[in-house]
């Protein structure tokens, strides 16, 4: 039974990574294009939307969101720092859910991602993860 739970958590982690990572890569593309066009981060991508909605430090928030959805999602897929990064992504998805509802846009995707990351906060990454491997290496009796 434990193996099935761990396999389910692996599938959930990898699915969460694949679904969210596509948005992170898209955002990296926006910023890469902006840099090559001589534009600033504040003029392209998420930062103008964040500023328009009245959130503070829009450039920093845009960079944090991009990190979450790219590197953070990849590390969750690997099962590394899972709970910490899932908490960061859940916070970002809560913001995306709020923004989607406020703008009258489709909010279901943000809600689904939020559920995935809250589940990973509560359960942890499971046995098939780098977190588990590092835990076993540090304390062999705990595995």
Where are these regions (language model features)?
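Extracytoplasmic catalytic/substrate-binding loops of multi-pass membrane glycan-assembly enzymes
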Residues: 38-43
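Extended, low-polarity transmembrane helix blocks
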Residues: 1-37, 51, 56-67, 71, ...
